[in-house]
UniProtKB/Swiss-Prot annotation:
GO terms for molecular function: asparaginyl-tRNA synthase (glutamine-hydrolyzing) activity; ATP binding; glutaminyl-tRNA synthase (glutamine-hydrolyzing) activity. This is Aspartyl/glutamyl-tRNA(Asn/Gln) amidotransferase subunit B. It catalyses: L-glutamyl-tRNA(Gln) + L-glutamine + ATP + H2O = L-glutaminyl-tRNA(Gln) + L-glutamate + ADP + phosphate + H(+); L-aspartyl-tRNA(Asn) + L-glutamine + ATP + H2O = L-asparaginyl-tRNA(Asn) + L-glutamate + ADP + phosphate + 2 H(+). Disulfide bonds: none annotated. Keywords: ATP-binding, Ligase, Nucleotide-binding, Protein biosynthesis. Belongs to the GatB/GatE family. GatB subfamily. Its EC number is 6.3.5.-. One of its GO terms (biological process) is glutaminyl-tRNAGln biosynthesis via transamidation. SUPFAM superfamilies: GatB/YqeY motif, Glutamine synthetase/guanido kinase. It comes from Anaplasma marginale (strain Florida).
C-alpha cells in the first residue's frame, strides 16, 4: 500500500485522508484557571495544589482574569470572532487524576469561533478554526509497578483548546499548521509551545474516504501527540490502518487511539465517547462570562506584529527571500536581534552573518539566540569593522569565533590579536613587486591570456601578509603591475 502525501493507493481504490486537530495549549499565567495555586513547572509532586484543585468540600472556583485575557488575545491573533457571552460547563467523567469527577470547560458557548490559519509551504490554503474555549487541565497519573501515584500540580492549570475544522488532507499540512500555531502563540506570549514538556498537546481526528467522495468516514481520535514528528507518523499510520480495514470488508469503529512511539503504530485505547456520554451542563458555581467591547478592543490594540505580517514586511520592505524572511520572523527573539542589526547594516551583509555564522555557532552549542554570547550590538560592531575596511570578511569570521568563545568585543579582539587589515598601498606595493619578480613564468603565462593566474598572485600576497592584506587593494595592485611592460 502506497501513501503519497494525503492520497493512499489501496488495492481497490485511492483513498483521501480527512484530518482535524484539537490542540491543548497551556496558558501562560502565574496561577491556575480557578485557583491561586502556582503553575510553575518541575516542582515536587503535589506542592502546587489549592484545596479547590482537589475538590475539597466547600471550595468554589474563582475565575482568573489573566487567563481570560490570554484566551481573547489568542482568539484575535487567529482571526476568530470573540464572543461577549460565554459559559463554563461541567464535563462529567471519572478518572483518578480528576478529583472532582468533572472538568470545567466551555461546551455550549465557547469564548471564540470562526478563525483561521493560512498555510503557505506544503500547500496554499486557509485552515478553519472552529472554536477556542477555556478549560481545566487534569492531574497526572504515574504508574510504578502495581501502584499508581497521583500528582495534582497540573490539575486546574488553564488550557486553551483550539479546534480546527477537518480541513487537512495530509500529515504534512497538519504538521505545518502546528508549526505556525506554535509560532503565533509564542509571538503573542500566550503559550510557550513546548511540546516536550506538555505545554502544547495535540489530538488528531483521522478518517479516510474514497477520492471524490464528499461524505466523511468514521473517525479515530489519536490522543496526546507531543511532537510534530509523532503527529505526522501517527496520522499516516492510522489512515493506512483504516484503509486496510475497509478494503478487507471491515468497518472502522469510532474509537480513541494511542500512538506507540517505539513501533510507530496506533492502537485502540477505548471506543470514542459521544457528547451525550459526558452529560454536559452549565457549572452552577460560575456565572456566565460577559466581556465588553472595550475589553476586547484594548487587547486587540496590544497585539504585537504577528509573524505572518512580519514575514510579509521583511519580504516587501527589506527585500528578503521567502526562506530568509520565514526564518527571521518565526521567533520574536530572532526578529528583535535581526532588526537591531539591519538598522545599522544592509540586509545582504547582516542576514548571512545571522543565519550562517551566528545560527551555526548557537546550534553547535545547543543554545537559543536569547542566550547568545554575541549580542546584536556586538555583531553590529564587528560588521562596522568589516564595512570600514579595518578587517576583511575572512578575518571577521575568525574574530566572531573568538567573540563567541570569550564574550569579548570585536575591537578588543582585533587589537589584542593584531588583526587589523593592511590597507596601505605603500606597505603592499613592495610585496607585490617582489612576488611578481620572483614568478617570471607565471607572469608570462598571465600576459599570454591565462588570466586565472591572478588568483595565484593574490594567494601569494595573502600568505605573505598572514591574510591581513586588503584583498581588493591587492587585486588592484597586481593587475596594475602585470599590465606594465
Amino acid at each position: 500500500m502506497a501513501a503519497n502525501t494525503g492520497i493512499i493507493k489501496g488495492n481497490t481504490h485511492e483513498w483521501e485522508m480527512v484530518i482535524g486537530l484539537e490542540v491543548h495549549a497551556q496558558v501562560i499565567s502565574n496561577s491556575k484557571l480557578f485557583s491561586g495555586a502556582s503553575t510553575g513547572f518541575c516542582s515536587e509532586p503535589n506542592t502546587q495544589v489549592a484545596l479547590f484543585d482537589v475538590a475539597m468540600p466547600g471550595t468554589l472556583p474563582v475565575l482568573n482574569a489573566r487567563c481570560v485575557e490570554q484566551a481573547v488575545r489568542t482568539s484575535l491573533a487567529l482571526s476568530c470572532e470573540v464572543h461577549k457571552y460565554s459559559v463554563f460547563d461541567r464535563k462529567n467523567y471519572f478518572y483518578p487524576d480528576l478529583a472532582s469527577g468533572y472538568q470545567i470547560t466551555q461546551f455550549y458557548f465557547p469564548i471564540a469561533t470562526d478563525g483561521h490559519i493560512t498555510l503557505d509551504e506544503c500547500c496554499s490554503k486557509d485552515v478553519r478554526i472552529s472554536r477556542i474555549h477555556l478549560e481545566q487541565d487534569a492531574g497526572k497519573s504515574m504508574h510504578v509497578g502495581d501502584k499508581t501515584y497521583l500528582d495534582f500540580n497540573r490539575a486546574g492549570v488553564a488550557l486553551m483548546e483550539i479546534v480546527s475544522a477537518p480541513d487537512f488532507r495530509s500529515p504534512e499540512e497538519a504538521a505545518e499548521y502546528i508549526k505556525k500555531l506554535r509560532i503565533i502563540l509564542r509571538a503573542i506570549g500566550t503559550c510557550d509551545g513546548d511540546m516536550e514538556n506538555g505545554s502544547l498537546r495535540c489530538d488528531a481526528n483521522v478518517s479516510v474516504r474514497k477520492v471524490g467522495d464528499s461524505n466523511l468516514g468514521a473517525r479515530s481520535e489519536i490522543k496526546n501527540l507531543n511532537s510534530i514528528k509523532h503527529l505526522a507518523q501517527a496520522i499516516r499510520h492510522e489512515a493506512c490502518r483504516q484503509v486496510e480495514v475497509l478494503e478487507s470488508g471491515g468497518v472502522v469503529s469510532q474509537s480513541t487511539m494511542l500512538f506507540d512511539v517505539d513501533t510507530c503504530t496506533t492502537r485502540s485505547m477505548r471506543e470514542k465517547e459521544d457528547a451525550c456520554d459526558y452529560r454536559y451542563f452549565p457549572d452552577p458555581d460560575l456565572l456566565p462570562l460577559e466581556l465588553t467591547t472595550a475589553f476586547i478592543d484594548n487587547i486587540r490594540a496590544s497585539l504585537p506584529e504577528l509573524p505572518s505580517e512580519k514575514k510579509r514586511r521583511y519580504m516587501q520592505d527589506i527585500g528578503l527571500s521567502r526562506y530568509d524572511a520565514d526564518i527571521l520572523s518565526s521567533d520574536k527573539d530572532v526578529s528583535a536581534y535581526f532588526e537591531s542589526v539591519v538598522a545599522k547594516h544592509a540586509p545582504d551583509l547582516a542576514v548571512p552573518w545571522i543565519t550562517g555564522e551566528l545560527f551555526g555557532a548557537l546550534n553547535k552549542r545547543g543554545s537559543s539566540i536569547a542566550d547568545s554570547p554575541v549580542s546584536a550590538g556586538r555583531l553590529v560592531e564587528l560588521l562596522d569593522l568589516v564595512a570600514d575596511g579595518t578587517i576583511s570578511g575572512k578575518m571577521a569570521k575568525q574574530v566572531f569565533a573568538l567573540m563567541f568563545e570569550t564574550e569579548k568585543s570585536a575591537s578588543d579582539i582585533v587589537r589584542e590579536q593584531g588583526l587589523c587589515q593592511i590597507t596601505s598601498e605603500e606597505t603592499l606595493a613592495p610585496i607585490v613587486d617582489r612576488i611578481i619578480s620572483e614568478s617570471p613564468d607565471e607572469v608570462a603565462e598571465y600576459r599570454q591570456g591565462k588570466t586565472k593566474l591572478l588568483g595565484y598572485f593574490v594567494g601569494k600576497v595573502m600568505k605573505e601578509t598572514n591574510g591581513q592584506a586588503n584583498p581588493g587593494l591587492v587585486n588592484t595592485l597586481i593587475k596594475r603591475r602585470l599590465a606594465e611592460d
